[in-house]
Amino acid sequence: MALAGSNRSVDGVRNAEREWHDAHYGAHAAYQYPESLDDFLNIFEKGQISRFCDGGWSWWGYARREVIDAIGDVRGLRVLDYGCGYGNLGLYLSCNGAEVSGFDLSQPAIETARKAARRYGLAAEFLEMDAAALSYPDDFFDLVVGFGVLHHVIKYPGADAHLFRVLRSGGRAVFHETLWDNPLINFARRFTSEHSDAGDAHLTEQAIRRFCRRFPQVQLEKRHLFYMLKRLAKLPRMEWQAELEPRPLWQALSSLDQQILRLRPLRYLCGEVIVYLEK
């Protein structure tokens, strides 16, 4: 079956995506996690996650903090780390009292997540799985959380139905995603984004709402206008920023956005969004 809007087959795109991520995660797995759980929590909580995430700049940790703040207290909740990658978000939520499951298309990523869970004595379960063929029971999770994953899965037929199916009635899903509604930000992404042959989607508000159409409650909280200058940190000639940890700069830009984006029409220009869903 051909992928919508493409002459490539769904299986062909899926295999290309798996191969790209297997190579990516396999190359970085050796230095993914520190030895002790305390060290992992310290690194995660400070946002200095260069040892186990792409790029390694402090702004990445700051964005992850936004997800954690958005989902709130997870104690006693059954949580799905959706497209978990190395599993660091799921492990952090497990440390905070959640019953965590995670899945990813990449086998090397899942192996790294499992090893970390065993090392830290956490009960989080990680499985290699396709978002369009989830094996979890119906109405199983209280919360689904994902960071930068919808642009990977939105193109696969059935992924939206499976997301809706595994979330219980009254359950929530929270995703932090990129937006491609601002032409200037999109131009900068040509130079600062990693590109694969897997046909990653350029998410617009319309595309996100279409993917989430089954949910009775959908809220998009658009974020980051000036803060999108963080993209400059991914230019090769500016890798020195990884050593300087310019976290105060990213926080200042975020504070500026909080003031500027009170003008609601400007929110259309934002480069990222937090997606809130409720079933």
Residue positions per predicted region:
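Conserved class I S-adenosyl-L-methionine
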Residues: 2-73, 174-196
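A short acidic, Gly/Pro-enriched loop at the edge of an enzyme's catalytic core
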Residues: 132-143
